[in-house]
From Swiss-Prot:
Pfam families: Hexapep_GlmU (PF24894), NTP_transferase (PF00483). Alpha-D-glucose 1-phosphate binds at Y107, G172, E187, K188, S205. NCBIfam families: glgC, PRK00725.1, PRK00844.1. Gene3D superfamilies: Hexapeptide repeat proteins, Spore Coat Polysaccharide Biosynthesis Protein SpsA, Chain A. It comes from Rhizobium radiobacter. This is Glucose-1-phosphate adenylyltransferase.
Length: 420
């Protein structure tokens, strides 16, 4: 990312975050919450990354469309994102599916989530709309994408990530020319088209779109009138524009925010238990690819006032310690040993317990002598004394949600079924 140009484009934009998805591949982690509300990084929620990018980019009008099990997400947004000032032309709207257009319809797709709220969006009169997915982990300055959108005269500008070509089969892929104009949009292709001049890589859609607002409103109205449409940006709106208008690809490397340019641009879809575990554990590295300590690009979130973490006991066989770990406030490590683990707020790890490669969500209690490795422990779980996880794959698979790579998800309902 080059030196930032001072432009007012972000102030004329509205960010619209699509946060209604369930995230079913996260299994029990999303039984009680939408994927954007899942905890990440020790104190934040996944949605905080898209919202923080918008705020740090200078965007001061934000809408968040919610749908699936939205209570915890809405509560988080109300508590952590209520600082916008209408008298300064700022706004923050939470937009649950509420059958505004039809008495029988919820949001039928991503485009429909915009269409059903046209009467809320249009009075703000933003010049540009930045459509964002609320369930990805990355840091990006949207001002650069807005500038490219204006300079290119595009109808839509699509954020794209360069990925090895044969890893792009699970994405929507952009087939572009030498000017990064999109010739074709292919959903999950078996043979992804390469990038001109770099054929070993493909441009995968990040689910980030920039439109002139007037054009977008016309597009979603036209789509709503089409009985054959699935009401989706990736399946309907974008392919229509590629065929009938001008679509341009914006490369994430041109606008990603990173503290060290030796690192590759960081973007993660933490949509599986393995990916979620790995992205959190990566934060325990000496210099992680994702810098959450960058004061120039903070990740804003709701944070309760908590006491600091505490480590107690220093006996030979009972020493409160943590190595290569992230430990949040209000944690008490009472004679327990942590290695390469990430603990959210309010965790209690009792004497003689050991955690290795563990992601522990808030308010978890670890019983004495528990030995846990390669785990994700859900919010509020009480781990019984002496429980061992990570040593017997067959037993772990019977008791918990164990992935093929050996990561175990532990929830309270699973613990309650144990015969200990």
């Amino acid at each position: 990312m080059s030196e930032k140009r001072v432009q007012p484009l972000a102030r004329d934009a509205m960010a619209y975050v699509l946060a209604g998805g369930r995230g079913s591949r996260l299994k029990e982690l999303t039984d009680r919450r939408a994927k954007p509300a899942v905890y990440f990084g020790g104190k934040a929620r996944i949605i905080d990354f898209a919202l923080s990018n918008a705020l740090n980019s200078g965007i001061r009008r934000i809408g968040v469309a919610t749908q699936y099990k939205a209570h915890s997400l809405i509560r988080h947004l109300q508590r952590g994102w209520d600082f916008f000032r209408p008298e300064r032309n700022e706004s923050f709207d939470i937009l649950p599916a509420s059958q505004r257009v039809s008495e029988t319809q919820w949001y039928e797709g991503t485009a429909d989530a915009v269409y059903q709220n046209i009467d809320i969006i249009e009075p703000y009169a933003p010049e540009y709309m930045v459509i964002l997915a609320g369930d990805h982990i990355y840091k990006m300055d949207y001002e650069y994408m807005l500038q490219q959108h204006v300079d290119s005269g595009a109808d839509v500008t699509i954020g794209c990530l360069e990925v090895p070509r044969m890893e792009a089969t699970g994405f929507g892929v952009m087939h572009v020319n030498e000017k990064d104009e999109i010739i074709d949009f292919i959903e999950k292709p078996a043979d992804p088209p390469g990038i001109p001049g770099n054929e070993g890589f493909a441009l995968a859609s990040m689910g980030i779109y920039v439109f002139h607002t007037k054009f977008l409103m016309e597009a979603v109205r036209r789509d709503a009138a089409d009985p054959t449409s699935s009401r989706d940006f990736g399946k309907d709106i974008i392919p229509y524009i590629v065929e009938h208008g001008k679509a341009v690809a914006h490369r994430f490397a041109d606008s990603c925010v990173r503290s060290d340019f030796e690192h590759e641009p960081y973007w993660r879809d933490v949509g599986t238990i393995d990916a979620y575990w790995q992205a959190n554990i990566d934060l325990t590295d000496v210099v992680p690819d994702l810098d959450i300590y960058d004061k120039s690009w903070p990740i804003w979130t709701y944070a309760e006032i908590t006491p600091p973490a505490k480590f107690v006991h220093d006996d030979e066989d009972r020493r409160g310690s943590a190595v290569s770990s992230v430990v949040s406030g209000d944690c008490i490590i009472s004679g327990a040993a942590l290695n390469r683990s990430l603990l959210f707020t309010g965790v209690r790890a009792n004497s003689y317990s050991r955690l290795e490669n563990a992601v522990v969500l808030p308010s978890v209690k670890i019983g004495r002598h528990a030995q846990l490795s390669n785990v994700v422990i859900d919010h509020g779980v009480v781990i019984p004394e002496g429980l061992i996880v990570g040593e017997d794959p067959e037993l772990d698979a019977k008791r918990f949600r164990r992935t093929e790579s050996g990561i175990c998800l532990i929830t309270q309902s699973m613990i309650d079924k144990l015969d200990l």
